[in-house]
Amino acid sequence: MFFRYTVTLVANETDHHATVVQALLRRHIGDITPGTTQEIENALETVCGQSKEWSSTSLAAIIIAVVARSTSRLLVGPSLCRNNDYINLCIEYATEMESSAAKIRALVPFLRPLIAPYYCRRLAELRKLAHAHIAPLLAGPDSAPKEKNASSQYTAVQWLAQKLRGVPEETEERQVARIMFLNVISIFTVMMASLNVLYDILARPDVKRALLEEIAEVSGGKGDLGLGDVEFERLRRLDSCIRESQRLNPTNWIILEGQAQKDLTFSTGLCVEKGSYLSICGGAILKSNGPPLSTSSNPPPIDEFHAFRYVTPDSGISTDVSTANGNSNANSNLATAISPTNLTFGYGRMSCPGRYFAVHSIKAIVVGLLLRYDVEFEKKDGEERGRPRNVQAGNVIIPDPSVMVRVRARG
């Protein structure tokens, strides 16, 4: 997204925001997810309403509104995550950044430093508006965590203020820019994955029925009200569906981009000069390295969507959700797993520290939407439509945001 232009240089100079989120999610993910789930449930009710009459809307509009609130719960806490002005600002900032990046991408490289500031004027204005909301949280007396069970304790803004207290160059403006940067990354990560998996589910009624059966079994018939962290972990069919959707719908073809800091010579004799850029074609790897279904006489083709590809004895996850947690090999098949053949969330030290939070949020969104609402694609030219095609712009691949659905509350 050309962060050096769209977020100012704070995203490139230091990674304080990344280390704060990594520490927060590593130590307190179990304290954070209940509040996130609650926020998603409340946001769905607010955005979708309770009418039992069909209404037409963009599924992308629903998801981005819900994700903006759940992300804000983590970043700035309950005091701001239900503030409509702040949430609308976050959504506009995310969409404006994507739009600005697309314009900058179209420029020849030598023109970017000259013209990019013109394209990013609105982003600077939005950061100033965000400062009015976030600055009191950075400067307040409760910047550091105090009460162990306070839901507002586990927010990125408070941890960031604590980490950067006394660092002269870290002004409030820079810290606000970091929070807004995290906001954009979180919104797009969860939104794109949620849209993709929902498109895959809505296009396959049999998959939807199987997921609803699993939710009923795991929750004991209590629906999403009976789901805590442990129950969400036991939704192995849904987890498999998410991983399969991400496998076939990567957000970028090229990943793990880096620049050689010195001359490199590989064991094959290949030489890479200092300053050269290196990257991996992650999309091709994901689409060519599904799990081997060795004991199946007729394994599903690797280039086709198979929702429960990872819910088989061969993959190490029991098809019996009541015993799946006892399988020691299960983790390698989870949506959060990282490996040389599953690069959705990066790999090694470049792996995404927020992947557990992201997958939990995706599950909560899917469960809440499927249980509480009837959702179906609008017919296209009077005919039922299948899975919407993705939209590709250069290296970026996104689910079609223009797809319309019909929604009504379940009675």
Curated annotation (Swiss-Prot):
Membrane topology: Single-pass membrane protein
Protein name per Swiss-Prot or TrEMBL: Cytochrome P450 monooxygenase sirE
GO biological process: secondary metabolic process
Function field: Cytochrome P450 monooxygenase; part of the gene cluster that mediates the biosynthesis of sirodesmin PL, an epipolythiodioxopiperazine (ETP) characterized by a disulfide bridged cyclic dipeptide and that acts as a phytotoxin which is involved in the blackleg didease of canola. SirD catalyzes the O-prenylation of L-tyrosine (L-Tyr) in the presence of dimethylallyl diphosphate (DMAPP) to yield 4-O-dimethylallyl-L-Tyr, and therefore represents probably the first pathway-specific enzyme in the biosynthesis of sirodesmin PL.
Main location: membrane
Protein's UniProt keywords contain Metal-binding: yes
Subcellular compartments: Membrane
Pathway as given in its UniProt record: Mycotoxin biosynthesis
Residues that coordinate or bind heme: C352
Transmembrane segment boundaries: 181-203
Enzyme Commission code(s) on record: 1.-.-.-
Coiled-coil regions listed in the entry: none
UniProt GO molecular function: heme binding; iron ion binding; monooxygenase activity; oxidoreductase activity, acting on paired donors, with incorporation or reduction of molecular oxygen
Organismal lineage: Eukaryota, Fungi, Dikarya, Ascomycota, Pezizomycotina
Pfam families with a match to the protein in the record: p450
Protein origin, superkingdom: Eukaryota
UniProt cofactor(s): heme
UniProt family annotation: Belongs to the cytochrome P450 family.
Glycosylation sites: N12, N149, N342
